[in-house]
Structure formats: C-alpha cells, structure tokens
C-alpha cells in the first residue's frame, strides 16, 4: 500500500470513530458560554497554536463569539515566558484577561498536557486556573487525552490508529472538529464567503 493510501485509510478510520453525540454536547456548551456573554479562550502549542489562531478567527467571524488565543500576542507571550517561565505563561495570561465563570477554555493539543512527564505544563496550569474560576473547559486532544481529558467538562479524544502518525492526524482533526463547531447551526450566525457568493 502506498503511503498516501495508508494515510487516507488512517484518516477514514479516525473519522469513523468520532462520537457525534459528544461533539453535539460540546457545541451546546460553547453556545451556552456565548449566549451568557462569556468569551472563548483557545490554547495550543506548536501546530496547535496555529490551529488556535485560525479557530479564533472562525469563532469570531462566523459565530459572533468573542474569542482569543494567547499565542497571537507574541510580545506578551515571550515576556511572560522570559520573566515568569513557560509552565505558567497561559495561566498568567488568563489571569490578565480576567478569566471568569462565564467564559470557556478550548484546549487543542496532541496529548492534552501531563505534569509528570513535563509535557505542555502550561496547558495544565491554565486548566487548573479555569477550574478554580468555574469556566467551562473543552478539549480536542489525542492519545489518552492527558490532563485535559481528566479535567474537561467535555472532550473529544481523537483516536490513535497508527502510533507512528499521531501528530499529523491529531492536528488535522483538530481542524475537522472546530470547523464542525463553527458551521453548526447552533453556533453559526454569519455566512462564510464562498457559500454566500451567488
């Protein structure tokens, strides 16, 4: 089998294992946060940070949801990393943003964060703060979901079908899932350009 066929077969297998009911529940939680005047903070590291930035655009433009990602502000991100350290960079940014119970946190991560293994401790600390503040916590994560899956109000775990190709599929399916969210009738309030061109 060619690599292209293998990769597409793996993607098909992942898609068939996603739980539509869980995704609908996540949409309901996002809609509730928006409708009560909450904001959406989307956090990710590496490729997931780029996905977070794209998702912020979609939630703001398509869903009318006030959304932000800390990795969009490079000056603050690097200042906090330099002055306070990488593990607390997102939690401190959320404190500065006055995270409150009405808000929602969406974690995009390949592994979901794990303090014991020192993997994405910044996500773990941000989730802990969100828990303290009573904010809604959501995740689109892979592997076993890490701390995100343990602490979230709702979490989509992208299944691993080939341990050699975890990251490419995780980051690709983050986009599949958040695009499902922003195009969902419960969240979408504005037409996307190409669908509205006559």
Residue locations for each model-derived region?
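A short, well-structured juxtamembrane/interface segment
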Residues: 18-36
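Short alpha-helices
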Residues: 132, 141-194, 198
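Generic N-terminal amphipathic, Lys/Arg-enriched alpha-helix
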Residues: 1-18
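Glycine-rich, small/polar surface segments that engage phosphate groups of diverse ligands
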Residues: 31-104
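Glycine/threonine-rich flexible loop motifs
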Residues: 113-123
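Surface-exposed amphipathic alpha-helices with a cationic face
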Residues: 60, 124-131
